[in-house]
């Protein structure tokens, strides 16, 4: 059983934190918003996702899942820290990683023993190096740590199912120590015989963007097919069932 903190209680942080606590780990979900933490502690879930409310209640009752706005203490009390804050698109079309950088600074200032720092947020390739440098800059006692990237592949409407029954888990790491620690986090998924795919940090960061781009490509494809069907008098519903029902062509 690991002691884990998720910084950020938005869509990714809340779903991931609840699901990982269901694996048997002790999880703290931390956020700077006192109001959001108050609501969560009172049983109010700020987002709707099928199965999430039940998952939260189950693990809160079991004592495995807690919420706090004391991010500094949550960092000190954990072995693994997941960065799960938002990275919204800015006016220039680029991801705004201001919150990620702020979290890295707080981690550096409060790291008190060896920890694994893991990014769940979708971040541009190369952000891992920036996070490491910020932590080191503020880690005045030179406490050792490892950094890993563990991108999420959650779909709205089936996020809980996607996390508990994934088709793969991607971990980007720099050494076996941090990789093995992350494998222990996902140990229960071995029961489902799901592969843990190990790669470099940069590749893990890129995989998320590649997956998003491929999804956009598939959606564009079926839209073009639908337009052709309308022009030619073909039935796009039947076509979808026949042609895209084959797993390698499925729109997901």
Question: Could you describe each region identified by the protein language model?
Answer:
Residues 76-77, 113, 166:
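Alpha-helix C-terminal capping/helix-to-coil transition sites in glycosyltransferase folds
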Residues 52-79, 89, 108:
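A structured beta-alpha segment of the ubiquitous adenosine-cofactor-binding alpha/beta core
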Residues 56-66, 141-145, 192-194:
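A short helix-to-beta-strand connector/capping loop
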Residues 88-153:
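Rossmann-like NAD(P)(H) cofactor-binding subdomain of soluble oxidoreductases
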Residues 83-85, 121, 173-174:
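Glycine-rich, N-terminal phosphate-binding loop of Rossmann-like dinucleotide-binding domains
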Residues 148-216, 238-241:
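Conserved Rossmann-fold dehydrogenase catalytic segment
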Residues 242-252:
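Single conserved hydrophobic/aromatic residue that forms the stacking wall/gate
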Residues 1-44:
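NAD(P)+-binding Rossmann beta1-loop-alpha1 motif at the extreme N-terminus of oxidoreductases
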